[in-house]
Amino acid sequence: MDNSLSAYTQKYDKEGYGLQCPDGHVIRFYERILKYKLNKTSGKLLDFGCGNGVHSKYFKNITGGGIEPYGIDIVPSLKKVWEKDPCLEAKNFHIISPNSSFKKLFNTQMDFIFANQSLYYLTKQAFKEAIQEFYELCNEGAIIFATMISDKGYSLYERGELMDNGLREVKGCPSGRLDGSSYIRFTKDIEELKEDFKPFKPLFWGDYELINLYNFEGSVEHFIYIGQK
């Protein structure tokens, strides 16, 4: 995550980065799992790697305020974005240093942990510590939703050797669309996914592709983990 700070600061500050609408797999998570299967549509939600807050606002709005969002990110300029957004309570959103503890930022327990496309930038040790902090922050019965990049992801890019911290350098976008490097922790399979999120109990798991154009940039397959305390 520290390796990604400069890259994402550049994207947000200079390139207008940030979703304007919620991801399709997030909408399906709410409609199919939270609303239909679990009937769990109220409580406090921690959005880890919340960016401009688009998913936090989605959960708040779709539930008529039943879900109260809190957020964490590492890009300093996002603080001003949250403060200007009338749909967000800026006091509930925090900037943290990469790979740092966050458990003392909140004086409340969470009913949902939401980590969409953010946890795989953490080193192996920081990831392990984050999962434990999530668990300690959660009320009994809380739901965690998280996504991780599968080993198929970015296979057409240049992927460096596995480093001691569990990350690989990813660079050389085959289409030339992206510059620079990212440092990513890849997940081999569903069994590794389930193991990584212990002590949460797995409820549902699967995968999705953002887009897979075989002759352009290839697969960006992600795994989905939905678990419970």
Regions found by a protein language model. Give the residues of each.
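A short glycine-rich, Lys/Arg-flanked "PGG" loop and its adjoining helix->strand segment in the class I
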Residues: 128-140
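A conserved beta-strand element that flanks and buttresses the S-adenosyl-L-methionine
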Residues: 114
